[in-house]
């Protein structure tokens, strides 16, 4: 993580963290369909890992599901605290679809209060990684035109 701290969610489940984990595991001898790419010294990106998961690569599936569970624990805390109507999952990992959402929902169900969790809806963002930039642009537009 760019903050320099250890153990924050960014160091555990970001695309970059998952990319580093898979490279470490490949170096240690774990089998994956991404080994050839690694052996050619080509960078492995999160989109490669998601594609590998869709092609039934066990290691890629495992890493994405692990990330989903960790995010789910954090989301459970937020649900318990803020009781949101909807949780929207975005970013690179949103492209993993059910590979990220099923373990995320499972962990959220396990670690949140049922009274609060039962009415919470989950959605995958259809926006790209530029969602933050779009949000800032909309805020500025609204401020300029006085909304």
Which residues fall in each region the model found?
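Short cysteine-rich clusters marking metal-coordination/redox-active sites
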Residues: 1
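ATP-binding/phosphotransfer module of carbohydrate and carboxylate kinases, centering on a glycine-rich
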Residues: 5-147
């Amino acid at each position: 993580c760019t903050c320099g701290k250890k153990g924050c969610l960014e160091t555990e489940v970001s695309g970059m963290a998952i990319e580093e984990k898979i490279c470490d595991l490949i170096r240690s001898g774990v089998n994956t369909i991404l080994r050839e790419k690694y052996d050619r010294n080509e960078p492995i990106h999160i989109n490669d890992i998601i594609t590998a998961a869709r092609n039934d690569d066990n290691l890629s599936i495992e890493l994405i599901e692990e990330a989903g569970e960790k995010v789910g624990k954090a989301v459970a805390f937020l649900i318990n605290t803020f009781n949101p109507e909807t949780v929207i999952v975005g970013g690179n990992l949103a492209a993993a679809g059910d590979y990220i959402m099923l373990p995320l929902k499972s962990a959220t169900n396990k670690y949140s209060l049922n009274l609060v969790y039962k009415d919470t809806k989950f959605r995958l963002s259809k926006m790209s990684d530029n969602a933050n930039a779009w949000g800032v642009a909309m805020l500025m537009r609204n401020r300029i035109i006085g909304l």
